[in-house]
């Protein structure tokens, strides 16, 4: 499977072409949404940096109509905070599409994951900071002081993405770890995370 966001928004017909060429089941449209002051949600591109002015709910519906097989839905507001998923956003998208919706952004513990699936209608969830910043130890149990880890602390320190050096796979001593998610509604999702050297430099 491949996930597409910026390319699809720049050329929505790309979804049609890709789904015809490879099948809908292989095409995941990633939507990065930010909540607005009027409680609407707009879609963003380039890792949540570029404003598009496109309504996220309408875009999800259009993505399905064009042949997307799944929606990977990221709440930029929640991502890296550890405050839990944006269940309102997930619910709004789930209510207008029939394809699976994968919720992403905000998970800090097992309750956030189970509550999101139970309360929002998500078919699956994706987790990132919980794993990237050591919220899970090696035997899979949760570390209690998650709030001192990862993006939350990074943002408090006024961190900038410019602080990160350029990386490529050949420079990383560890490459791919595959997390096989539970099977929901007959769909099996595999989320692949790149695990970079944590103490590099």
What does each of the following model-derived ranges do?
Residues 62-70, 96-99, 171-182:
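A structural motif corresponding to the C-terminal end of an alpha-helix
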Residues 15-22, 114-194:
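C-terminal helical cap(s) of enzyme catalytic domains, especially alpha/beta-barrels
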Residues 8, 62, 77-97, 101, ...:
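PLP-dependent amino-acid enzyme catalytic core
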Residues 1-73, 77-78:
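Conserved anion-binding
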Residues 29, 63, 71, 93, ...:
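Conserved, mostly hydrophobic/aromatic
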């Amino acid at each position: 499977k491949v996930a597409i966001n910026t390319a699809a928004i720049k050329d929505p017909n790309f979804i049609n072409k890709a789904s015809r060429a490879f099948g809908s089941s292989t095409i995941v449209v990633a939507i990065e949404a930010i909540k607005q002051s009027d409680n609407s949600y707009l879609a963003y591109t380039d890792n949540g940096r570029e404003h598009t002015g496109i309504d996220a709910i309408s875009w999800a519906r259009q993505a399905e109509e064009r042949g997307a097989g799944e929606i990977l839905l990221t709440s930029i507001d929640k991502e890296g905070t550890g405050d839990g998923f944006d269940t309102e956003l997930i619910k709004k998208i789930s209510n207008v599409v029939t394809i699976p919706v994968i919720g992403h952004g905000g998970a800090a513990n097992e309750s956030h994951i189970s509550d999101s699936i139970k309360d929002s209608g998500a078919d699956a969830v994706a987790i990132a900071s919980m794993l990237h910043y050591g919220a899970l130890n090696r035997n899979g149990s949760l570390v209690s002081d998650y709030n001192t880890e990862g993006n939350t602390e990074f943002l408090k320190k006024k961190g900038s993405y410019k602080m990160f050096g350029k990386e490529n796979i050949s420079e990383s001593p560890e490459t791919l770890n595959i997390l096989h998610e539970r099977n929901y509604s007959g769909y099996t999702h595999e989320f692949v995370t790149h695990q970079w050297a944590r103490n590099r430099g």
